[in-house]
Amino acid sequence: MKTPLQQLVGSLVIAQACAAGAAEPVDGQQIVRAGTTPAVVGPEATFTGHVRVEQLWPATPQITASGAYVTFEPGARSAWHTHPAGQRLVVVSGVGRTQEWGKPVQELRAGDVVWCPPGVKHWHGASPVTAMTHLAVSGALDGKNVEWMEKVSDAQYTTR
């Protein structure tokens, strides 16, 4: 179940993105109701552990950023990756981790906001014992918003 903050942020952003991305002029707001977008399991090639991705809106010519809720179960994480136009993460629940290549692992908590600059190699996911959900807003450049790399090893994940 989503928290009121998740529902509010998701509803506001979806409404804005849908209205801005419509092919025809719109006389008013468009609303996509919470829970109407199906979640998918994060692919094994780019995630370790159980991850659910709920795509909220796609990048459009009007707003060149996509958005999704990503939920990582305890111990789950992304592979190393970069974003050609950057990514902002808003942790909405739980406890997580992130790491920039060559730097220490950082802990994330609900309410934290992370800016991942373009081209910076990093990963993010849940803590070993607590799930974490974040809202990911990823900029797109030439239709691409991520470059996936190798998986994060258990040693990299557990090193503090």
Indicate where each model-derived feature is located.
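Bacterial N-terminal signal peptides that target proteins for export
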Residues: 1-9
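Hydrophobic h-region of N-terminal signal peptides that target proteins for export
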Residues: 12-21
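A short, N-terminal "cap"/entry segment at the start of jelly-roll beta-barrel domains
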Residues: 21-64, 146-160
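Conserved short histidine dyad/triad with adjacent acidic residue
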Residues: 52-55, 66-83
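Short glycine/proline-enriched turns and hinge-like loops at secondary-structure junctions
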Residues: 64, 82-83, 102, 126-128
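A short beta-strand-loop-beta hairpin characteristic of the jelly-roll/cupin
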Residues: 77, 82-110, 120
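Structural recognition of the beta-strand scaffold that forms the well-ordered cores
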Residues: 80, 89-90, 115, 134-136
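Ligand-binding loop in jelly-roll beta-barrel domains
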Residues: 97, 104-105, 109-110, 118-145
